[in-house]
Every structure is written in C-alpha cells, then in structure tokens.
C-alpha cells in the first residue's frame, strides 16, 4: 500500500458523504411536500403527475447512467493526474448529455399523446389531459436535467459534493415556492406543478454549468473541448454508461410489472405497500448517498494504478456504509409508528406497514451496502459487465419470479413481494462481496 491510501482522510471522506446524504434527504422531503401541494390541485392532477413520473423515471435513469459513466472516467483521469483529460472527458459528457437529452425531449414532445395512451389508455379523460399537460412541460426540462447531472458528475468526481448540495437547496426552494404559487395563487392545476420543476431544473443546469467553467476547480469545462468531438473519450464513458443504463432500464420495467402484481391484492395491502414505499425511500438514503463516494474514491485509486489503495478504501467505505445504514434504518423504523399518525389508515393496514418497513430496513442495513453501494465501486474499477449481468438476472429471476411465487401462488401478498426484494439484495450482496474479495475487478482498464 502506498501513499495513495492517505489521499482520502476521514475528514475528506466525511466532507463528501455528509453533503450527499443531506442532498438526498432534502430531495426526499421536498418530494413529500410536493405531493402534499399537488393533492390540492385535484385528484386528476395527482393521478396525472403520478403516472407521468413513472414514465419520466425511465429517462432520469438514462441520464443518471450517462453521468455515472462520466464520473468513473473523470475520477480515473484525476487519479492518474491527467486533469486536462479529466476536463475534456467532462466537457464531452456535457456535449453528449445535451444532444442526447434534446433528442429524447423532441421525441417525447412529438409522440407524447400516443405514448401515454399506449401506456395508460384506460384512464379517465381528465387524468389523461393532466398526463399530457404534465409530460409536455416535463419534456422541456430533460436537457436541463441531463446537463445538471453532467456538471454534478464533475463536482462529485473532484470531491466537492457541497456544491451540488447547495444548488439542490436553492433549486428545491424555487420548486416549492413555485408550486405554492402555481397551485394556490394562479390555480393552474397540473401546469402549476410542472412549470416550477422546469424553472428549478433550468436554474440548476445553468448555475452548475457556469461553476464548471471556473478554472480554480481541479477539473473544469473548456469551450474548445465541448465543441470538439472526441470519440475515444465518449467510448470510455459509454463503456460504463450503457451497461449501467441497461441494468437500470430492466429494473424500472420490473418495477412496473411488480406494480401490476400489487394491483391484484386487496385495497388495504395496496395502501400499505404505497405508504411503506414512501418510508422505504427515506430509509434507503444512506446507501444511495454512498454510491457516488465509492465511484470517486475507487475511481481515483484505480486511475492512479494503485489497486492496493482501492482495496483499502473498499474496506473503509463498506464499513462506513454499514455503520451509517444500520443507524439510519434503525432510526427510521423507530419513527415509523410516529409517521403512521399522519395517515388515515385502518389498524390492520398500519400493522402491515410496520412489518413491511421492518423487513426492508433490516436488509437495507445488512445487504444493500454490498448490493448497492459496493457495486458502484466495482463499476468505478471498470467491472461493469459483471455487475450488469448479475443485477439483471437477479432482478428478473429472483425479485420478479419470486414475487409472483410468494405473492400470488403462496398468497403472501405484499409481504411476499418484500421478501422477494430483500432476497434479490441478499443474493447480489453475496456475489458482489465475493467479486470484490476475488480481486478480479483489479484487471480491468477504463482509460
């Protein structure tokens, strides 16, 4: 082990982790506030926003996968002390993200009504009208979202996660205030919810792009790199992004299929599952926040050719993830009875929610640090195909098929689906932990 192992002190790691965690927590809390405000716009607006967000998530995953691929490449070049190459990679990521997202937006704007009727054709006319309005406005924000993700990848790669946190604070304040004005003052219905999101995302995209041009940063954008196509850099980014995007795409499709299975159960089980998922999202914040940290740290170590340092930080980051996840999941579970006071649910439904949260949180603390956060470290080392194959096979063969077997055949309902979910995590956790211990990930080359 050489001096690279001292590159990331405990203080530096915490300076990366805490802003990422707070940013994710803020996004979650603002999302809950948005849901509350949207409910005052009417049931059609609530339904329209909910359905379109399922559709939007597909593209959000694609933009996130692209940014993650960029973050891996940027981190590795930083580790190799080739900051100009890191900057050119970041600039190429910006160019490709902008072009790709504009094409997606144009496609959605042209075919939005047909797409929605194909996916949600049986909904009422008022709901469909809300869907079309919300999707059309949302599509205009795709380029802003992709451009922001590209800039966020740069800042996270250089360890300045506080930048994205502060931008997130400001943009979410804009979003919340805009929603209140749109819904309560202008009474614009679903448009009153959609336009503030467009404005907030555009603000974030413009601000982070301006900040990325500042030459005081370790890595920064340059116009000559943005407008000069470099096939080699894009191949490096897409080599990581495409498998990651395919993995996320399959996961999203399975989620849609699972929603169909849940719809077969009784009303109280559907309600319990919906409430539990909200609490699950809150409980999962610790593991989700650690993902970019693994990418930055392991990516820089491997870029420097120091596999021993990467091995060292795999252990350190995994321990931190386990500790934070365990404490956070325990706290959320203890607060669940308090959360239940805000829901008008039957006692039977509340008891089911608590059981679902218990199942989720135990395994989110014990298994997800390996199946989720640690797998990002493997990707940062270039071991992307293995993680993709394992994740796709496990998602389909374990989560989907086991949900059908336990939930429908054995009549376990949503409890069966929750068990299938944690079985998926556990299997991936064991495989990824074994993969990390095997050292096979040390043999890959990204740049």
Regions found by a protein language model. Name each.
Residues 15-34, 137, 148, 171, ...:
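Transmembrane helical elements of multi-pass membrane transporters/channels
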Residues 38-57, 89, 125-130, 190-191, ...:
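Interfacial/gating helices of multi-pass transporter permease domains
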Residues 4-36, 40-41, 57-69, 73, ...:
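N-terminal transmembrane alpha-helices
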Residues 18, 22, 52-55, 95, ...:
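Hydrophobic residues within alpha-helical transmembrane segments
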Residues 46-106, 145-164, 259, 270-336, ...:
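Small-residue-rich hydrophobic transmembrane alpha-helices
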């Amino acid at each position: 082990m050489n001096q690279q192992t001292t590159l990331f002190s405990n203080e530096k790691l915490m300076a990366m982790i805490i802003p990422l965690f707070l940013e994710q927590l803020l996004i979650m809390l603002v999302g809950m506030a948005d849901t509350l405000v949207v409910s005052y716009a009417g049931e059609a607006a609530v339904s329209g926003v909910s359905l379109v967000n399922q559709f939007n998530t597909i593209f959000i995953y694609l933009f996130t996968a692209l940014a993650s691929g960029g973050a891996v490449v940027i981190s590795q070049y930083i580790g190799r002390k080739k900051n100009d190459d890191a900057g050119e990679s970041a600039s190429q990521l910006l160019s490709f993200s902008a072009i790709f997202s504009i094409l997606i937006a144009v496609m959605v704007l042209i075919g939005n009504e047909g797409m929605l009727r194909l996916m949600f054709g049986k909904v009422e006319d008022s709901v469909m009208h809300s869907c079309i309005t919300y999707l059309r406005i949302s599509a205009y924000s795709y380029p802003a979202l992709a451009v922001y993700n590209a800039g966020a990848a740069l800042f996270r790669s250089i360890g300045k996660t506080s930048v994205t946190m502060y931008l997130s604070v400001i943009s979410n304040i804009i979003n919340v205030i805009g929603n209140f004005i749109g819904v309560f003052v202008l009474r614009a219905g679903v448009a009153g919810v959609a336009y503030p999101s467009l404005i907030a995302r555009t603000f974030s995209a413009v601000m982070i792009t301006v900040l990325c041009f500042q030459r005081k940063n370790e890595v920064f954008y340059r116009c000559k790199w943005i407008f000069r196509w470099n096939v080699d850099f894009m191949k490096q980014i897409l080599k990581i992004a495409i498998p990651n995007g395919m993995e996320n795409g399959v996961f999203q499709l399975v989620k849609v299929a699972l929603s169909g299975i849940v719809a077969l159960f009784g009303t109280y089980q559907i309600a319990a599952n919906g409430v539990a998922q909200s609490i699950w999202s809150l409980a999962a914040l610790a593991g989700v926040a650690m993902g970019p940290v693994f990418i930055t740290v392991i990516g820089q170590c491997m870029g420097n050719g120091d596999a021993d340092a990467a091995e060292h930080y795999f252990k350190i980051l995994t321990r931190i993830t386990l500790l934070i996840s365990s404490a956070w999941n325990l706290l959320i579970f203890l607060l669940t009875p308090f959360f239940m006071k805000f829901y008008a649910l039957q006692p039977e439904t509340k008891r089911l929610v608590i059981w679902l949260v218990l199942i989720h949180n135990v395994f989110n603390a014990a298994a997800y640090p390996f199946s989720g956060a640690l797998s990002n470290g493997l990707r940062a080392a270039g071991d992307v195909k293995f993680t993709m194959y394992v994740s796709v096979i496990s998602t389909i063969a374990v989560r989907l098929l086991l949900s059908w077997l336990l939930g429908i055949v054995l009549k376990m309902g949503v409890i069966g689906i929750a068990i299938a979910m944690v079985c998926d995590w556990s299997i991936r956790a064991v495989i990824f932990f074994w993969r990390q211990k095997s050292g096979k990930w040390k043999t890959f080359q990204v740049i």
